[in-house]
Amino acid sequence: MVLYSMIDYKAVTNELINDDTCAQGSVYATFDQLVSLLGEPFGSSADGKVQAMWQVKFGDGTIATIYDYKEYDTAVEDVTCWSVGGHSERAEGLVEAILSR
């Protein structure tokens, strides 16, 4: 886990920035916690595998995506285990850090 007292980050909602990211791990949070921290989700997937996704860009350039994957039988508001995507495991650590503040 990345332990920083101040982590610079922003949710990106006006453009797609998650090209070539892949699964790096998962985090536990409620939908409401994520909305409170990052705002409304950026979107969903056309194939229905993802109901909600957030994109986060950290100050060091790390990009992370937070999304429910194949939670077909669970309403998005009830999902508590979220996949984290990125280009490295650092993405998961940074997401864990901002969730634990």
Residue ranges and their predicted role:
Residues 2-101:
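Residues within mature, well-folded domains
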